[in-house]
Every structure is written in structure tokens, then in C-alpha cells.
Amino acid sequence: SQSRGLGDVYKRQVCDECGLYWYEDPYADGGISIHGHQTLKKHVKTPILITEFVRNLETATDMMVAGATDFARGDPDYDGGITGCHKLAYAAEGLGMDIEVHSCGPAMRHLMAACRNSNYYEVNLVHPKADNAWSLPVYQGGYSDQLDCVDADGCVSVPDGPGLGMAYDWAEIERTALDKVVLK
């Protein structure tokens, strides 16, 4: 739950009482203030996870070095691909921090498998009665990022085919396309 400002965040000390593993992106403005997060960390015990809205290695590293976050957050779709996120993971590891990968998909699974300091696969926006809106049926072979992708041991498999391990289902992509643009 995001806050409008530091006064709102003080009310969020309930996270401490509940023993939550982290408090993610506490500020509604995108959470890019190093000073704001340093100040917040003085008033809550729950570890802070930010950098989801920080779009480059240098700024995310600055936030980690400044003590504004307890975790790094990386997303191959926005943070320089798998390579850019892997660099961020190494920076976090060098500072004794973990990186948590944002969102789901084959690239995210491969990134997590390549990082020894990542813990949780995000199957986002799910509920037992609602599908994951980010899990689009664009891959062949039954790949899924629905709740059932997590096995009985709490693990998620990593595709092992060439590239990211998945082949696109072009028939399904074309069937559900709303428009087509050809660049020449």
C-alpha cells in the first residue's frame, strides 16, 4: 500500500507488527527519493524494497549504497534486459543485499536462476479466483505464470529450450492480435 507522504508512512508501522518480509515501494510518487527512504527507514523496522521505478544501474546502486533500500528490484523488461539486471544483482550482492525480480515470464525465471541472491518469483496480480493478467497465452508447450506454476515445494521451473527456453505460439498471437504494423 503506497502512501502520499512520510506522515502517512508512520501509520504503516503495522508492517512491523505483522512481521512482513519487506515493505515494497512505500511512496505513491514512484519512490525515487533517497532522503525520503532513508528517513522512513529510521521509523520502521520492516525492510524496505524499492528501485522498481528506478530505471538504471547507477541510480539503483546509489540508492543501495545510500542505505535507502534493503533490497534491489530488477525487471528485464525495463532495466537493460537480463544483462542489465544481472549487473544490478552483482552490485546488490557486493553490498550484501538481495535482488528481487519484478514480474513473471521466461526472462525473469532465467534471471533468477542465474542469481544466487534472489529469493521469490513474483506471480503477480493473482488470487485463487482470478487469473494472472500478465500471463498471456503466447508460448507453446503449456507454459504458464498462473498460480499453479508454483510446485508443491514452492518452486517454479526454468524453461530449458534454446534462448529463453520457449517457442512462441504464433497462431495464437495472430488470432488475438488487434492490429498489425509492418516496418520496412
Please provide the spans of the model-predicted regions.
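C-terminal extensions of enzymes
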Residues: 137-184
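Periplasmic-binding protein-like
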Residues: 24-25, 99
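Shared catalytic-loop signature of beta/alpha-barrel
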Residues: 13, 19, 30-155
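Fold-independent oxyanion-binding glycine-rich loops
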Residues: 26, 52, 160-161
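Single conserved hydrophobic/aromatic residue that forms the stacking wall/gate
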Residues: 1-10
